Amino acid sequence: MLCLGIETSCDETAVALFENGRPVLEKLASQADLHAVFGGVVPELASREHLRRLGPLLQALFAASGRSLADVDAIAVARGPGLLGSLLVGLAAAKGLSLATGKPLIGVDHLHAHLLAATIGRDVAFPALGLLVSGGHTQIVRLESALSLEVLGRTLDDAAGEAFDKAAKSFNLPYPGGVYIDVLGRGIAPDKTLFPRPFLDNDHFDFSFSGLKTAVASYAAAHPELRAGSLAEAGGAIDPEAWPMALRRACSSLNFAIAETLRIKFERALDRQPGPPASLIAAGGVAANGPIRAMLADLAARRGLPLYLPEPALCADNAVMIAAAGSRLAEAGYAHDLALTAVPRGRKVPWDYAGGPSGKAASVDSASPAQ
């Protein structure tokens, strides 16, 4: 099966072809430079850029791959959660292509696709316990199979990625700041007491990073030397040696606080599974963070479980994961009609496919049992 994937959920415009379990080709246009001027994603600009770039990217994809739309067996598109205006651009394109060609349309849960990115090209054993960490979501998910999911815990306010982004703003780091915090903290021993490990004094698997955001902002306000305007330009590229040691230690300490918080909750969930999972999975943009990847590798080694992490390029938003998830869904007989709707961030993505085997899989954004 050859599946076309379309990703426009936030600020990456991407299209990809995926065939028989392997990516064929992806074309991606990043908007990072556009939004860097504003210190974050501007939704109106993001949707306009998707509209401008999506058509040429599709043309470039088919030209470079030697394939045509006639070769495609299914059309998959990210339907949410994400920025509503951005999602609508991708959905409009996918619906138009489906209507014109008669090819099946598959709306893909963006979070589900992130988790399945860790399985691309790998024979992952199920059930698996998954950790999804991104700019907008932090979840612990049990995967009975690739298409059967149960959310065990999620963030009650801010996600881990949001904590990284807001901390970067507090320290006046360039956008996207999470990458700077990761790189600047490398090789520096963290001060393990500098920042709190939030929301651990409970007995469930949910997260809250709002308190950590406040702690970092307070620390930055008390140390204005870390927010000097010149810091944003120091070193040009990410050259850790060009940045003040005090800032690097703060970044290392923040990496530790977030990684340790994730570890404690993830290990708590692992201990309370009805049966031991066969695999561990982690995915999402924050899963590219070095200390978090190292923490997960250590946890997996201690538990004697295989750990599956996406390649760094597949941690960020991309169309390969949308096409891969769409392929699995299409092969199982799932599809949508043209009434498919976009689901903005903060809303549950419904499992409203037509066809497929009996029984439903839970949405990846379903409510946590702890709420």
Swiss-Prot record:
Pfam families on file: TsaD (PF00814)
Residues that hold substrate according to the record: L132, V133, S134, G135, G136, D165, G178, D182, N289
Subcellular location: Cytoplasm
Keywords: Acyltransferase, Cytoplasm, Iron, Metal-binding, Transferase, tRNA processing
Listed InterPro entries: ATPase_NBD, Gcp-like_dom, KAE1/TsaD, TsaD
Binding of Fe cation, residues: H110, H114, D317
Entry EC number(s): 2.3.1.234
Entry keyword Lipid biosynthesis: no
Catalytic activity reported: L-threonylcarbamoyladenylate + adenosine(37) in tRNA = N(6)-L-threonylcarbamoyladenosine(37) in tRNA + AMP + H(+)
Entry keyword annotation includes tRNA processing: yes
Gene Ontology biological-process annotations: tRNA threonylcarbamoyladenosine modification
One Gene Ontology term of the molecular function aspect: N(6)-L-threonylcarbamoyladenine synthase activity
Cofactor annotation comment: Binds 1 Fe(2+) ion per subunit.
Gene Ontology cellular-component terms listed: cytoplasm
Cofactor(s) of this protein: Fe(2+)
Family stated for the protein in its record: Belongs to the KAE1 / TsaD family.
PANTHER family cross-referenced by the UniProt entry: TRNA N6-ADENOSINE THREONYLCARBAMOYLTRANSFERASE, TRNA N6-ADENOSINE THREONYLCARBAMOYLTRANSFERASE, MITOCHONDRIAL
Protein role: Required for the formation of a threonylcarbamoyl group on adenosine at position 37 (t(6)A37) in tRNAs that read codons beginning with adenine. Is involved in the transfer of the threonylcarbamoyl moiety of threonylcarbamoyl-AMP (TC-AMP) to the N6 group of A37, together with TsaE and TsaB. TsaD likely plays a direct catalytic role in this reaction.
Protein name as annotated: tRNA N6-adenosine threonylcarbamoyltransferase
Species for this entry: Solidesulfovibrio magneticus (strain ATCC 700980 / DSM 13731 / RS-1) (Desulfovibrio magneticus)
Organism placement in taxonomy: Bacteria, Pseudomonadati, Thermodesulfobacteriota, Desulfovibrionia, Desulfovibrionales
Gene that specifies this protein: tsaD
